[in-house]
């Protein structure tokens, strides 16, 4: 999903027979509203395969509440320290346990969570520990792969998440997804290939032990560099819809507008077929033995 709002403006201009995207701000905003309207109509309230995302955070001793990503819509799976955490209804949490709950009440049951409001995560029981920072000896970068060396065993695993802090350049810092673990003192993550190597500073790595997969919200396009929320191969759906909205107000062009909306519907039909293939057919099937 790399097609930008700027790309859409240019491609729509070409379809309209124009040499370039408009410079008039009113017309630019008008066409942007068409693209956003098209994206909302195309995606609707469905859980499309490409709207699945994964984020992480770090538990804090004695802290129950954590903020989820701003695009959070609905939870798919939550893991704490690698273990699956079971959802519980908010009213059940209040009705079943002392609130806030005590750890000993959960010794024989699965830890739970519930969501309050739009993106407020509550963990039950309240975490009683937090990951410790691990000192980093060095970070080097080759071809976009950052290799981290720690002074002691880090305890991390492939596809885990960490927070890097204290590094210069700052591109190494922040939430990082571990792409490989060579041994107990080395792991890698992706970084821009132009990032200066090696990193300097007093560097630490801290495990992000709360990992959640979720369905994300569709965000309207605003800046020219914003990318569309659907796969690039279906971008023509947005262009066709915007074209129909643009020419639909021109006398004598109603038929052309209808053709554009029909094109939009056909592309969305293709996207729906791909959704069905991924959800139904692209799954492992247990063989039948005679």
State each model region's role.
Residues 1-130, 205-290:
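Glycine-enriched, solvent-exposed interface loops adjoining structured elements
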Residues 130-216:
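Small/polar beta-strand repeat architecture
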